[in-house]
Curated annotation (Swiss-Prot):
Recorded family membership: Belongs to the class-I aminoacyl-tRNA synthetase family. TyrS type 3 subfamily.
Binding site for ATP: S216
Keyword annotations: Aminoacyl-tRNA synthetase, ATP-binding, Cytoplasm, Ligase, Nucleotide-binding, Protein biosynthesis
Protein name in UniProt: Tyrosine--tRNA ligase
Position of sequence motif 'KMSKS' region: 213-217
Organism of origin: Methanobrevibacter smithii (strain ATCC 35061 / DSM 861 / OCM 144 / PS)
GN (gene name): tyrS
Residue span of motif 'HIGH' region: 40-48
Residues annotated to bind L-tyrosine: Y35, Y156, Q160, D163, Q178
Subunit details: Homodimer.
Cell compartment(s), UniProt: Cytoplasm
Keyword Ligase part of the UniProt annotation: yes
Length: 319
């Protein structure tokens, strides 16, 4: 596979790659390193699965995958005690394995290296180069809204920057909520003569309630290990306004998970409502926009797909 073909695969389903010319150079390496960091703070849901899909693509293209289980970051972001976060990290790691990342994937706890002398030295150095305003702005979409923010909220993005050095990262992957932090990292790492990673950003899924972001803290998610009953209940109650495709979580799930994996979505219906249909992406958008596909029929199709698609995850988690 040529470098151009690899880039096309990497760009598919992403919002941006910063930047493509740098990525070309990275792809010339024998085994470049790609990483994503996750706060161990709750259930692993479809929002996480978006980035895991891309990690699996990178893995197939020869990347070494490192997943940072950012326990100290979760603590700084008020997600629980160190003990609670450690327990969640174990569960999260099992979920990521269940999603199909292979045995070469390296899982790393932030606390395993973030107290090292060299790491701390770089954090202090970057703290002298980063304005308070810039650090706080980078956290806009990552931390909870707080009218009286803690100092921890500005230490967080500086640590995330140094993580990229400590893990020897060539590619940093994250959802769009990570963009401001990653742009800060690119600027600051250049200032201290460290390797600047390529940054890849994936789209955020709307919550099942129509909120701008699917989040475990808001409860508006489908967990990758949800039971058949839980998936059915959550999809039935989900936001799916008739005729609207923008910001519709059912359409987003179809675009993010169904069509990258199969050509059509099967929607089972009683004969009196037209019988079963299989829709391509284009047909789905047209039929739903025109009112020819009822929201409940779309929900049922998405529900059936998710139940089948994540069956291996449920089985793995039950072992």
């Amino acid at each position: 596979m040529s470098i151009e073909e690899k880039i096309q695969l990497i760009e598919k389903g992403t919002l941006e790659v910063i930047d493509t010319e740098e990525l070309k150079e990275v792809l010339k390496k024998e085994q470049p390193i790609a990483y994503t960091g996750y706060e161990p703070s709750g259930k692993i849901h479809l929002g996480h699965a978006v980035t895991v899909q891309k990690l699996k693509t990178l893995q197939k293209l020869g990347f070494k995958i490192k997943i940072l289980l950012a326990d100290f970051h979760a603590f700084l972001n008020g997600k629980g005690s160190i003990e609670e976060i450690a327990e969640t990290a174990e569960y999260n790691m099992k979920c990521f394995k269940a999603l199909g990342l292979d045995e070469t994937t390296e899982f790393i706890l932030g606390s395993s290296f973030q107290l090292n002398e060299d790491y701390a030295s770089k954090v202090y150095k970057l703290a002298t180069l980063t304005t308070l305003k810039r650090a706080r702005r980078s956290m806009d979409q990552v931390s909870r809204h707080d009218e009286n923010p803690k100092v921890a909220s500005v230490v967080y993005p500086i640590m995330q920057t140094v993580d990229m050095v400590a893990l020897d990262v060539d590619v940093a992957l994250g959802g769009m909520e990570q963009r401001k932090i990653q742009m800060l990292a690119r600027e600051n790492l250049e200032k201290i003569d460290e390797k600047v990673p390529v940054c890849i950003h994936t789209p955020l899924l709307h919550g099942l309630d129509g909120d701008a972001k699917m989040s475990s803290s808001k409860g508006n998610y489908i967990a990758v290990d949800d039971s058949v009953e839980e998936i059915t209940k959550k999809i039935k109650k989900s936001y799916c306004p008739q005729g609207e495709t923008e910001g519709n979580p059912m359409i987003e799930i179809a675009e993010t998970f169904v069509y990258p994996n199969q050509e059509t979505l099967l929607i089972k219906r009683p004969e009196k409502f037209g019988g079963d249909i299989e829709l391509t992406h284009e047909q789905l958008i047209n039929d739903f926009s025109n009112g020819d596909l009822h929201p409940m029929d779309l929900k049922n199709g998405i529900k059936d797909f998710l139940i089948e698609h994540f069956a291996p995850v449920r089985e793995y988690m039950e072992e």
